[in-house]
Amino acid sequence: MNPLRRKRLLIILAILVGVGIAVGLALSALQQNINLFYTPTQIANGEAPIDTRIRAGGMVEKGSLKRSGDSLDVTFVVTDFNKAVTITYRGILPDLFREGQGIVALGKLNADGVVVADEVLAKHDEKYMPPEVTKALKDSGQSAPTPAKEG
């Protein structure tokens, strides 16, 4: 084989191997960072994977918020008005977190059907509702409740 042709072949092979490694690393990173959204109904029906990072969202049930007296542990129930799921969280809840309003929790579903959240996102004004929560409420035949005016 001609030395010039051999050199070109090695360069092309090196480029192909490099591109293959880059694509593999990119796909691996994307796979680890994908957090699929599940409604409380889907979680209760067993559609959400256990011990995999997910997003769970819905409306916080009134009267379900329980705070630990000696730690930052919080437990509350989220519903899509069909079924409900319990969420536990250790940390400070967002200022806009309220019972009766929409939230999205990021965490893992344990074997008991409880979402152990490491992040809780609250809706940030009266008009905004996460698209997934809006769709879940619409599918259940409910509409997002209008918050009471404060003041």
Swiss-Prot record:
SUPFAM superfamilies (UniProt xref): Heme chaperone CcmE (SSF82093)
Membrane topology category: Single-pass type II membrane protein
Amino acids binding heme: H124, Y128
UniProt record, GO biological process: cytochrome complex assembly
MF-aspect GO terms: heme binding; metal ion binding
Chief place where the protein resides: membrane
Cytoplasmic side stretches: 1-8
GO terms under cellular component: plasma membrane
Regions of this protein lying in the Periplasmic compartment: 30-151
Subcellular localization(s) per the UniProt record: Cell inner membrane
InterPro entries from the UniProt entry: CcmE, CcmE-like_sf, NA-bd_OB-fold
UniProt keyword terms in alphabetical order: Cell inner membrane, Cell membrane, Cytochrome c-type biogenesis, Heme, Iron, Membrane, Metal-binding, Signal-anchor, Transmembrane, Transmembrane helix
Gene3D superfamilies reported for this sequence: Nucleic acid-binding proteins
Transmembrane segments: 9-29
Similarity section: Belongs to the CcmE/CycJ family.
PANTHER family per record: CYTOCHROME C-TYPE BIOGENESIS PROTEIN CCME HOMOLOG, MITOCHONDRIAL (PTHR34128:SF2)
Role played: Heme chaperone required for the biogenesis of c-type cytochromes. Transiently binds heme delivered by CcmC and transfers the heme to apo-cytochromes in a process facilitated by CcmF and CcmH.
Name of the protein: Cytochrome c-type biogenesis protein CcmE
Organism field: Pseudomonas fluorescens (strain SBW25)
Gene from which the chain derives: ccmE
